[in-house]
Swiss-Prot record:
Keyword Transport set for record: no
UniProtKB keywords: Disulfide bond, Hydrolase, Secreted, Serine esterase, Signal
Main location: secreted
Functional note: Catalyzes the hydrolysis of complex carboxylic polyesters found in the cell wall of plants. Degrades cutin, a macromolecule that forms the structure of the plant cuticle.
One Gene Ontology MF term: cutinase activity
Enzyme category, top tier: hydrolase
UniProt-listed SUPFAM superfamilies: alpha/beta-Hydrolases
Name this polypeptide is given: Probable cutinase 3
Length: 215
């Protein structure tokens, strides 16, 4: 319990230290272009980190979406955050999957929706912090047909990096890119939060390049 208190305190401190979102950024904290929009050539499904607002968060989800749209065309990419039962609460980080079953199911629902609503779309995905565990656990359990539609994944501050050896189990390793910032202890099988854990936005363009390269 003492460790949990330290984690909550660290997250609160870092959240206060993080730069305030601009108006444009605040407006992009959520994206539901798969659920509410037309089918597009590419669908990007993203799970935010613990305590982040909206369904895309602020740190790295929206900038990766923006980078994809700049590279492929805004009318070619649908960005969809994982919301619903995934509330990005802190405590599920301490479970064996580093998240909880309902959060994993919420991501799986989005992958299934992409297949049923937009059977011709190419799916790419990503997750940050707890969201990386959500995507990891969801993708590895997808049926073979749906998994084959997921062309690439980017994982930032991957909480299961050590446990899953820098990859998503039962998914092609060359279709996954893991980003672990120098000094981010989350990537090394701890839940110790440092300032490095807030830096992943700088990798958004590189992540988009990787996702595009796998289409």
């Amino acid at each position: 319990m003492h460790f949990r208190a330290l984690l909550v305190s660290a997250l609160a401190t870092l959240a206060m230290a993080a730069p305030a979102p601009t108006l444009e950024a605040r407006q992009s904290l959520s994206s539901n272009e798969l659920e509410n929009g037309p089918c597009r050539d590419v669908t990007f499904i993203f799970a935010r980190g613990s305590t982040e607002q909206g369904n895309m968060g602020f740190i790295v989800g929206p900038p990766t979406c923006t980078a994809l749209k700049l590279k492929l065309g805004s009318d070619k990419v649908a960005c969809q955050g994982v919301g619903g039962a995934y509330t990005a609460n802190l405590l599920p980080n301490f479970l064996s999957q580093n998240t909880d079953p309902k959060s994993i199911a919420a991501a799986t629902d989005m992958f299934q929706l992409a297949r049923t609503k937009c059977p011709n779309t190419k799916i790419v995905t990503g997750g940050y912090s707890q969201g990386s565990a959500v995507i990891d656990n969801s993708v590895k359990a997808l049926d073979d047909d749906l998994k084959s539609r997921v062309k690439a994944a980017v994982l930032f501050g991957f909480t299961r990096n050590v446990v899953d050896r820098g990859q998503i189990p039962n998914y092609p390793k060359d279709q996954v890119k893991v980003y672990c910032a120098v000094g981010d202890m989350v990537c090394y099988n701890t839940l110790i939060i440092t300032a490095a854990h807030l830096t992943y936005g700088i990798y958004a363009n590189d992540a988009a390049n990787f996702l595009v390269s796998k289409l």
